[in-house]
UniProtKB/Swiss-Prot annotation:
Keyword Transport found: no
Keyword annotations: Ribonucleoprotein, Ribosomal protein, RNA-binding, rRNA-binding
PROSITE patterns: RIBOSOMAL_L10 (PS01109)
Name this polypeptide is given: Large ribosomal subunit protein uL10
GO cellular component: large ribosomal subunit
Family as reported in the entry's similarity comment: Belongs to the universal ribosomal protein uL10 family.
Stated role: Forms part of the ribosomal stalk, playing a central role in the interaction of the ribosome with GTP-bound translation factors.
Provenance organism: Rickettsia felis (strain ATCC VR-1525 / URRWXCal2)
Gene Ontology molecular function: large ribosomal subunit rRNA binding; structural constituent of ribosome
UniProt xrefs under CDD domains: Ribosomal_L10
Gene Ontology terms: biological process: translation
Quaternary structure note: Part of the ribosomal stalk of the 50S ribosomal subunit. The N-terminus interacts with L11 and the large rRNA to form the base of the stalk. The C-terminus forms an elongated spine to which L12 dimers bind in a sequential fashion forming a multimeric L10(L12)X complex.
Record Pfam families: Ribosomal_L10
Sequence intervals crossing the membrane: none
Amino acid sequence: MLRSEKPVAVEDIVNIYKESPSVIITHYHGLTVSQVSSLRDSLKSKEAGFKVVKNTLAKIAANQTGLDSIANLFAGPTAIVYSKEPVEMAKLVVNFAKANDNLKIIGGIVDNHVLDEHSIKELSKLPSLNELRGKIVGLLQAPATKVVGVLQAPSSSMARVIQAHASKN
């Protein structure tokens, strides 16, 4: 990389750190081009990205954005995975790492909190934001449907009693 290209590359990484509240740092040594392409495609469908970074430039970008605590994670063949939705991204990366031993999760950041590999795996087990919204809506609707059922029950049971009494006579 030319010296004149380095500030532009650092600025790209700084923008990723600023615009994405969640970043996972990985080692990708041994992944084939087709495996990386497959990972990128699956991430793209979830509005996430995968970027191979130079460690020194990633450290500089981390220092410029106040993320000094992750600078020590950049060693070896490093790539960052970034997204605005941490749970979906973590699920994709963890599942891909299970299927491909050459992708190693090193750590990451979610909302300025540094996570280790274990924490990212635990994050991937959580329901996504959309799943949580669906559960909340379901919980809010459940009492209303129960109230309607309770209100309708006396009138329907009263109608059955009258019908039974009428059929006897």
